[in-house]
Amino acid sequence: MVVGAGPAGAAAALEAKRLRPGASVALVDKADFPRDKACGDGLGPHAVDELEALGAAGVLDGYPPIRGLRLRSPRGMEVAGDPARPNYVVPRAVLDARLVEAAQAAGAELHRSTARRLEQRDGLVVVDGELAARVVIGADGANSTVRRLLGVASNPDRALAIAVRGYAPAPAGRPEQLIAWVAEGWPAYVWSVPTGTGVANVGYGLLRSRFHGDRAELHHRLRDLLPEADPDPASLRAHHLPFSSFRPPPGRGRVLLAGDAASLVNPLSGEGIYYALASGRLAARAALTEPDDPLAAYRRLLAKALGRHLRHAAVLARAIHAPALAEAGLGAAAGSPRLFDTLVELGLGQARITPRLLAALPRGLARARAATRGTGSGPAGRTR
C-alpha cells in the first residue's frame, strides 16, 4: 500500500507493478486529481532518467526541454550557460495527474482516503482498522501523517525551508531558468523557471529559522526581489521543504517513508522531484524483494543511490551560510563549463564535491569580486 499519490507515491506504485505485475498495489490519496501542488516544478536530467526507468517518460509530453540556465549571486555576479543535459518544467497539477494515470494503467488501484491510524501486527500493517498490507510506503509529503504516526521527528527549523510559488507570464526570448541567491533572509533564493508554454514558475524561499513573518510578507518579498515577474495572485501558494541535511529514519518496521515524507529535499536548491521518484522506486523494490525486513533493504538502497551526494550537498549548504562561498562557487563556474555542470548537479542530481571544485574556489572568489567591484553587481559569464 502506498499513502500519497505525488511523484514518490506514483513512482512506488509504478515500480511495484513493473517488478511484479500480479502484485496488489493500493495507491491512497485524499485529493482528486488533477490538483495543484506548490512546488518549483523542475525536473532535472536524473528525474527524467527515473521516469524513463519507470516507463513513464510520456508525462513530459507537451513540455519542451529548457536548456538555458542563469545563476546569480547576492552581489550580482552572474554565470549563464547550457548544462550538459536540459531540464524540464512541468506544473505539478499536470505531472502528478499523469503519473497517477500511468500507475492506474499499470494496474494500481487508486483510493480516495486518508490514513489516520497505523498498527503493525502479525506481519501486516493495518491502516485505519480496515486496509491491510505487508508493507506500507508513506509518500504523503512534507507534512506527512504517516511519519507523524510512526513517531518520527519533524525537521527542525534549521533544516526546514518555507517558500512561496506563483505562476507568471514567461519572459520574452529564449527560455532560460533563473536561480538567484539573495541577501534578503540569507541563505535564500528566488527563481523563475519557464515551462516552455508561455508560463513561468516563480518563487522565493528561505530557511524557516530565518523567517518570522506571515504569508503576506512572503508575497511581498517575492515581488520585491523578482520585480520583473507578475505572478497571478490566485496562483501564490506557500509550502515547506524538509531538507535532507536532517536525516530521520526512513521508516519503522514494515512502514517506509519516501520523498518529502523522508526529508529528501536538496538543501542547496530545494529540488525534490528527482529524490521523490528515486526513493519511491527504491522503496517499492525493497518492499517486494525483502518484505520481511523491507526497512533494512531500503536503507541500503538509499545509501547506495543517494547517500554520498546528499552528504556533500549538506556540507555545501552549511558552508554557504558564508556568502563569500556562493560568490566563489559562481566565480569558479564562470571559468569552466565542467565546474558549471558540477555546481548544477550538486543542486539537482548526483554530483559530489570534487578536488577540482575545491581548488577552483579561491580563483572563483577573486573573479567574482573583480566582476562586482565598485558597482555591487557584475556582468554574466557564459560557460558554453
Locations of regions flagged by a protein language model:
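A conserved beta-strand/loop capping segment in the N-terminal third of enzymes
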Residues: 21, 48-100
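FAD/FMN-dependent oxidoreductases across multiple families
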Residues: 117, 210-287, 292
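C-terminal helical "tail/cap" subdomain of flavin- and related membrane-associated enzymes
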Residues: 285-384
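Short, well-ordered alpha-helices that flank and scaffold nucleotide-derived cofactor binding pockets
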Residues: 14, 18, 49, 101, ...
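Generic enzyme active-site microenvironment
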Residues: 27, 138, 258
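N-terminal Rossmann-fold NAD(P) dinucleotide-binding loop
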Residues: 9-10
